[in-house]
Amino acid sequence: MERIGRINRRKIYYVQIRNNTEWKFSLPKNDWVAFTIANKEDEQLVPPAAKICMDKNVSYTCSAGTLAHWTEQYFDEEITGRAFDYEMQTKQEFDYESSPITTAHQNFNEGFWFATTLAHDAHKEIDKVVCLDFTKRKVKKHLTELIDKINNGWLPSDEEIELAEYDN
């Protein structure tokens, strides 16, 4: 995992998931935002990554790429499954207030801006955003450009759909 910048008090990290078996060991242990970037060809990588993020106590997930809504839905299903398991084991009602919040963004730039500036948890301070890049073509360069723009007052467009710019 590589630190690629900072926005206000949040440190921004980037990790390429594809062909990188070590990525999961570098994730924070708690209180962090996952900004996921996944496209159709990355679908098989999402389920195990969602489980790992949940195991690492992710506080918020913001999903982008052509699989944004599917990725968000998968995180929601993982949360629900864990809640069900908790209720079956403890015979107590699960407190969804302690669950991660999930969002999907068809506008890539807006999603990154949201993850780095607005995503929050009322109960804990979030000071890390980890960009989990599932793609073959990589978006690291685009993310570093967005960090500079956001730090200089840039706001995302109102376009409903805006795709990522890829490194290659």
Residue ranges and their predicted role:
Residues E2-N168:
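ATP-dependent carboxylate-amine ligase
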